[in-house]
């Protein structure tokens, strides 16, 4: 990806280091919003934005190095602050009947297995930006589908 963007190692490190700050920043914004907007609504919007951004990245990844990729790439970790916090809160609510420890363990296991499967897929192609965009889109769509299905089956609408 660094070569596709045409970044020096230093510029790449600073850019993605700055991106990493977007996750706690968006999480702080989420903490304020969740008092007024239901967590499920915030999660759905974050996943929709994540999927839309990934979809926009696909043609940009196909056309070669582009500075236009950078702001779109920044939106992915920004949405992670909303997705992680709200998905975890809603999941804990759904599984609290089996016990907090068991539920937390199951969630952690699932996250690590998913990361182990998804990470190689993102870099499987020679065009890393394309692989990342396709994988991000697929993950956002699957997650959104899960939120819709679980939300429909839940008696609790939050």
Q: What kind of region is each of these model predictions?
A:
Residues 1-11:
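Short amphipathic helix-loop junctions that connect adjacent transmembrane helices
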Residues 9-17, 105:
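Small-residue hotspots at the loop-to-helix junctions and early N-terminal turns
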Residues 15-23, 111:
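Transmembrane alpha-helical segments of major facilitator superfamily
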Residues 20-28, 116:
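Residue-level signature of mid-helix packing/kink "hotspots" within the transmembrane helices
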Residues 26-41, 126:
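Helix-to-loop junctions at the C-terminal end of transmembrane segments
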Residues 41-87:
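C-terminal transmembrane helical hairpin of 12-TM major facilitator-type secondary transporters
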Residues 87-128, 135-136:
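A late C-terminal transmembrane helix in Major Facilitator Superfamily
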Residues 137-158:
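Multi-pass alpha-helical transporter architecture, strongest
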């Amino acid at each position: 990806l660094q070569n596709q963007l045409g970044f020096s190692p230093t510029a790449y490190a600073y850019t993605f280091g700055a991106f990493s700050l977007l996750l706690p920043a968006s999480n702080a914004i989420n903490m304020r919003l969740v008092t007024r907007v239901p967590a499920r609504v915030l999660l759905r919007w974050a996943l929709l934005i994540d999927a839309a951004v990934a979809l926009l990245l696909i043609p940009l990844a196909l056309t070669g190095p582009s500075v236009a990729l950078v702001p779109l790439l920044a939106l992915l970790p920004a949405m992670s602050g909303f997705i992680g916090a709200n998905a975890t809160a809603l999941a804990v609510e759904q599984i609290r009947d089996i016990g907090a420890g068991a539920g937390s363990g199951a969630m952690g296991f699932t996250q690590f297995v998913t990361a182990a499967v998804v990470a190689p897929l993102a870099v499987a192609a020679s065009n890393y930006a394309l692989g990342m965009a396709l994988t991000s889109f697929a993950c956002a769509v699957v997650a959104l589908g899960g939120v819709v299905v679980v939300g429909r089956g839940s008696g609790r609408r939050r």
